[in-house]
Amino acid sequence: MKAKEINWTDVDFVTTSASYYTVVAEQPNGVMNGLYCLNSLVFPYYDTANTKEKIWWDQFKSDYDYDPNTGAIYGYIFADIVVEAIKRTGEDLTVNNFVKAMETLKDYEDPLKLSSVSFDPGIRHGSNISYFFQVQNERFEVISGPINY
């Protein structure tokens, strides 16, 4: 982080969920250590993953020849949500019917059980929890949460 280069070390940096990406935390020499951010799911690092998460990780690595990152997990989870809504829409797939089907998702858990989402006509953000993370040793570590909002 540029702030460390200019010795601006007495300031804590808190970012949005957009920075919750493994490539951010994994910058060499711990340059991102100390960064804080919020996000609605906890990335399953392989060494701390449960059996289901490891099976998914191994399959991803077998298919793509590299370890999954947060983008991979988001893609997997978001695709699962969309596929479930399409199934619930039925044969008459229109935008309006798809939206109505999305609104039937209540406490819907993704296959890895990392997060659950709910939608209705007044709730469009899906999740209502966040975890507070700090980059430590080039990985995101939960320091608080889940926090309801």
Give the predicted meaning of each segment.
Residues 2, 81-84:
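Alpha-helical scaffold segments in soluble metabolic enzymes
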Residues 62-72, 83-139:
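Segments of small-molecule ligand-sensing domains
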Residues 50, 54, 76, 80, ...:
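Electropositive phosphate-/nucleotide-binding environments in soluble metabolic enzymes
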Residues 1-75, 136, 140-148:
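Extracellular/periplasmic periplasmic-binding protein-like sensory domains
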